[in-house]
Amino acid sequence: MATASVAFKSREDHRKQIELEEARKAGLAPAEVDEDGKEINPHIPQYMSSAPWYLNSEKPSLKHQRKWKSDPNYTKSWYDRGAKIFQAEKYRKGACQNCGAMTHTAKACMDRPRKIGAKYTNMNIAPDEKIESFELDYDGKRDRWNGYDPSTYHRVIDLYEAKEDARKKYLKEQQLKKLEEKNNNEKGDDANSDGEEDEDDLRVDEAKVDESRQMDFAKVEKRVRTTGGGSTGTVRNLRIREDTAKYLLNLDVNSAHYDPKTRSMREDPLPDADPNDKFYLGDNQYRNSGQALEFKQLNIHSWEAFDKGQDMHMQAAPSQAELLYKSFQVAKEKLKSQTKDTIMDKYGNAATEDEIPMELLLGQSERQVEYDRAGRIIKGQEVILPKSKYEEDVHANNHTSVWGSYWKDHQWGYKCCQQIIRNSYCTGSAGIEAAEAALDLMKANIARKEATEESPKKVEEKRMASWGTDIPEDLELNEEALANALKKEDLSRREEKDERKRKYNVKYNNDVTPEEMEAYRMKRVHHEDPMKDFL
């Protein structure tokens, strides 16, 4: 068990140690220094910064985390390809039976198999190969480019350049050939049109030949290799990550503290430098700028919506939360604009150049305005031409004239069919003839009825009673009997409300006197009477 060799501490000392570590992490206290005078990052966990017990380390240090084993003398050299060391003149015992070299056997020989080997001919003895042995480290064994000679790639470049020169030469020959054909073929309009087409072809070929005349946005300035390997791009279209990391801007140990766990540097690493020349001002500078505020507002909105019962969570469904927040912002802006428009429509806009009415400035006006029964202004403002309150030049339901073009018996109608019912279907001249026939028939019936009657009956004159009923004029009522009838009517109505008080052997008198009839008429509720609630 690798534990740190620390002495026993009391509860108070342990609390102070914890507070000191928290202050070091927050940057309020200076960092701990090891035995070599180097600062120890306070964010390193204790199980990594504490030395094992068997090292007997009394001072804080990180030497136990560093590599203490010395590496062997690894080399990055590679085999000398095709190198020869010694060439014998005659066959040697143990050499290759095919070529005569001592460095390999006949089974591993890479030369052409001879019809009669060098062992028997003792001629054309091959030289011995240079045998090398390297001690490679872990990375050297897996380096796929180890031993590669970059100078050999010039042959590939020369091959592509030769192909490009041949292509340009061929295009130039084609261009000269078309120019000769153009000079030899000058025949009228057809020749002119052909010449224009040839000029277009020449322009295209010229663009292919001369790459220096390409557009500025497609100009190839420099070829760079991307991190993925194999793909290339232009300097204009490809961003090269040559910017310096923020923890390397200031190598002073007392400068802004960098937290490797969260990759944050809250303070400005170069506080004395020109702000125009700096691209990084510290994390605190960007916490309240850019999209950081939008993200903060999004979190606050998701919390408030969740507290109000909305199924919205920023960590569980971030896309849904962002979509709901955007819809909320749109609805909020729409409501705000509607409120603004409503207020401006009601009170006006003081920023406009329109003259403010006197009614709004003084609260009153001396201008006299007169209206007609239809609510139209007839006097008091600018002169208004008389205009019909009905829609003009609108012919509905097959009519050929507008409503109000016909007048009869104090009623408006349609002139085309003489109908006085609005929105009725037009019957034309047939409807006019039918109406006239019905009118003639009605007049004939009235005349026939008057002729058959010998003497008209006298209409009995009636007068309205006080409560709206018709009674004969010669009717005489007894005032005392009328008062008794009114009392009796009130008593009967009270008994009707509660029939349980009616006696079993009650007797009714069905004879109605004129006074009782008048009392009934006086007590009866008239629903059409506007004063019935005050009786």
Swiss-Prot record:
Gene Ontology molecular-function annotations: pre-mRNA 3'-splice site binding; single-stranded RNA binding; zinc ion binding
Ranges spanned by the short sequence motif Nuclear localization signal, renumbered to the chain: 486-493
Organism: Arabidopsis thaliana (Mouse-ear cress)
Primary role: Participates in the second catalytic step of pre-mRNA splicing, when the free hydroxyl group of exon I attacks the 3'-splice site to generate spliced mRNA and the excised lariat intron. Together with SMP2, involved in the timing of cell cycle arrest during leaf development, in a STRUWWELPETER (SWP) dependent manner; promotes cell proliferation in developing organs.
Any single GO CC term annotated in Swiss-Prot or TrEMBL for this entry: spliceosomal complex
Tissue spec: Mainly expressed in tissues undergoing cell proliferation, particularly in lateral organs.
Modification type Phosphoserine: residues: S193
ZnF (CCHC-type) ranges: 96-109
One GO BP: positive regulation of cell population proliferation
Keywords tagged on the record: Metal-binding, mRNA processing, mRNA splicing, Nucleus, Phosphoprotein, Spliceosome, Zinc, Zinc-finger
Acidic residues compositional bias, start-end: 191-203
Statement: the UniProt record of this protein carries the keyword Mitochondrion: no
InterPro entries: Slu7_dom, Splicing_factor_SLU7
Protein name, UniProt field: Pre-mRNA-splicing factor SLU7-A
Major location (coarse): nucleus
Region: Disordered, residue numbers: 21-44, 176-204, 489-508
Family, similarity comment: Belongs to the SLU7 family.
Location(s), subcellular: Nucleus
Disruption phenotype: Reduced organ size due to lower cell number and reduced fertility. Cell proliferation is arrested precociously in organ primordia. Altered expression of splicing factors required for the transcription of the cell proliferation gene STRUWWELPETER (SWP) and for the timing of cell cycle arrest in leaves. Double mutants smp1-1 smp2-1 are not viable at the gametophytic and/or embryo stage.
Compositional bias of kind Basic and acidic residues: 176-190, 489-501
